Amino acid sequence: MSNFWNAFSVYNKDKHSANSKIYGSNHMNLSTGTTTYLHSNEYREPTSKDVKDGNEMEKQRRMSESSLDSSKRRVSQSTIDDISKLSQGEFKEIYQSLRKGEPSNKVNF
């Protein structure tokens, strides 16, 4: 059981030892410019069967009701309004419609 609690220790005395138990990275303080992957001790590569199951799950997701509903919806085209040609009332109306549903971030001093 002591190995489980070692994960919560503040200082790992074996951190800089030659036989460190850190997994999945090069552990240098230099930036290599590439993506570094950190894996847990229990990490395993997915098998080809798992990958095939993932493709099957993707097909099922695409055929779900929510995906079919979203594909039926049309994307509305945004209109571009020239602010310099708007009256003050029109500008205020557009401004308020853009802020609809936004939280009130007013601060009282």
UniProtKB/Swiss-Prot annotation:
Residues forming coiled coils: none
Family recorded in the similarity comment: Belongs to the SPG4 family.
Short name of one Pfam family: SPG4
The protein's name in its UniProt record: Stationary phase protein 4
Region of interest called Disordered, as start-end residue ranges on this chain: 37-81
Transmembrane segments: none
Matching InterPro entries: Spg4
Described purpose of this protein according to its UniProt entry: Stationary phase-essential protein not required for growth on nonfermentable carbon sources.
Biased amino acid composition, Basic and acidic residues: 41-64
